């Protein structure tokens, strides 16, 4: 069964906006400048993933681009891993999470490349 990439992208977008607002209003007085910068990076990249995932789903559903599921899975996993680990580091999470963050980034890149490949083949 193909996941509803549009729904998942919209959900990630909502979480991204909420995370950004929480960072600006709830964490600004509690985090140092570097940690706040990390939090903002996590929220921003979550939005990038949300928009890409929504676009992947929309174009896939319209039949403009076929075979988008691989891209969707990579974009979803990459967004969650990258943004999740960066946000955890901003909040003082264990430093070993820094070694996991590039896995999320690599999955995001793979998702964009798989989407490009699917678009090229369609």
Protein language model regions, located:
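Polytopic transmembrane helical bundles with strong interfacial aromatic enrichment
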Residues: 1-122
